[in-house]
UniProtKB/Swiss-Prot annotation:
UniProt biotechnology annotation: Is a good candidate for development of an efficient and cost-effective enzymatic-based method for preparation of ornithine.
Function: Catalyzes the degradation of citrulline into ornithine, carbon dioxide and ammonia. Contributes to intramacrophage survival, in vivo growth and pathogenesis.
CN hydrolase domain segment(s): 4-258
Protein name in UniProt: Citrullinase
Catalytic residues, chain numbering: 43 (proton acceptor), 116, 153 (nucleophile)
Domain of life: Bacteria
Record note on disruption phenotype: Deletion of the gene results in loss of CTU activity. Loss of the gene does not affect acellular growth, but it impairs intramacrophage survival in resting as well as gamma interferon-stimulated macrophages. Mice infected intranasally with the mutant show significantly reduced bacterial burden in the lungs, liver and spleen compared to wild-type Schu S4-infected mice. Mice infected with the mutant succumb to infection, but they survive longer and show significantly extended median time to death compared to that shown by wild-type Schu S4-infected mice.
CDD domains: CPA
Organism (species): Francisella tularensis subsp. tularensis (strain SCHU S4 / Schu 4)
Length: 286
């Protein structure tokens, strides 16, 4: 299918889930009415980023996929507006919790769930306390409009994940994100590095990349962090073709002909000339 319009939504969030969901709904509808068929929103957008510190009260936010308010909302919106809409949510499954994506196709059906594989554990990003790592591997979904691969935030720093999704047939890579300041390094700004690593995935795999980040300063549990927005879209060469500011609500748009991009990947020969027999070290633990 030629000329598919995609969108990236950038927003700020607070501690009121209903308000956050209303903001998301408004922007998703706006993007859909402007012709977007695949729409990406940030990581865990129902709440403030609660992983700054370890606090057991936040486990009350975890819901099963059937209970999750954001999954319910996104299913309704996907069906009504005929859009592909990945839903990032705090998933509870039995006694375990995950940082998950429910991939929702344009008919409102859930195609499957991806659970974040790479879980950070640093100052201001205490995710290992909250989330078990996903172990089912990286997934690509054959949606109505494109074959879509999704990594969640810290996954975006690992080229292996992007390459696996490309080898599984992904035509576009999506990265919902929550990234900003480092509380122990107040003068450090990772924004450019963050963008470049995903631009590299786009260029190395000749796939467009969408990255959606939250923005604004959030203070909870006696710790403050500023999320720097700067959401962006790249083309298949890694060139940024749309970018949001460090703050402010925004919707970014781009249009891709995925059949044409497939021909360019064939022409360039990156996958033809791979030498997997030489890459054993990549899968070893050192």
């Amino acid at each position: 299918m030629a000329n598919i319009k995609v969108a990236v939504v950038q927003l700020s969030f607070n501690d009121n889930e209903a308000e956050n969901l209303a903001k998301l709904e408004s922007k998703i509808i706006q993007a859909a009415k402007n012709g977007a068929k695949i729409i990406l929103t940030p990581e865990l957008p129902s709440y403030l980023y609660f992983c700054k510190k370890q606090n057991s009260k936040y486990f009350d936010l975890a819901k099963t996929i059937d209970e999750s308010p954001i999954v319910k909302l996104y299913k309704l919106l996907a069906h009504k507006y005929n859009i592909v809409l990945p839903a990032s949510f705090f998933e509870r499954d039995g006694n375990a919790c995950y940082n998950s994506i429910a991939m929702i196709d344009a008919d409102g059906s859930i195609m499957g769930v991806y659970r974040k594989a790479h879980i950070p554990d640093g100052i201001g990003y205490q995710e290992k306390y909250y989330f078990s790592p996903g172990s089912a591997g990286f997934k690509v979904w054959d949606t109505k409009y494109a074959k879509v691969g999704v990594g969640i935030c810290w996954d975006q720093w690992f080229p292996e994940a992007a390459r696996v999704m490309a080898l599984k047939g992904a035509e576009i890579l999506l990265y919902p994100t929550a990234i900003g300041s480092e509380p122990h390094l107040p003068d450090y700004d990772s924004k450019d590095h963050w963008q470049r690593v995903m631009q590299g995935h786009a260029a190395a795999n000749m796939l467009p990349v969408l990255a959606s980040n939250r923005y604004a300063t959030e203070a909870n549990d006696d710790i403050t962090a500023t999320y720097y927005g700067s959401s962006f879209i790249t083309d298949h060469t890694g060139d940024k073709i749309a970018e949001a500011d460090r703050s402010g609500d925004d919707i970014l748009y781009a249009t891709f002909d995925f059949a044409e991009l497939q021909q360019q990947r064939f022409y360039w020969g990156l996958f033809r000339d791979r030498r997997p027999e030489l890459y054993d070290e990549i899968v070893r633990k050192y």
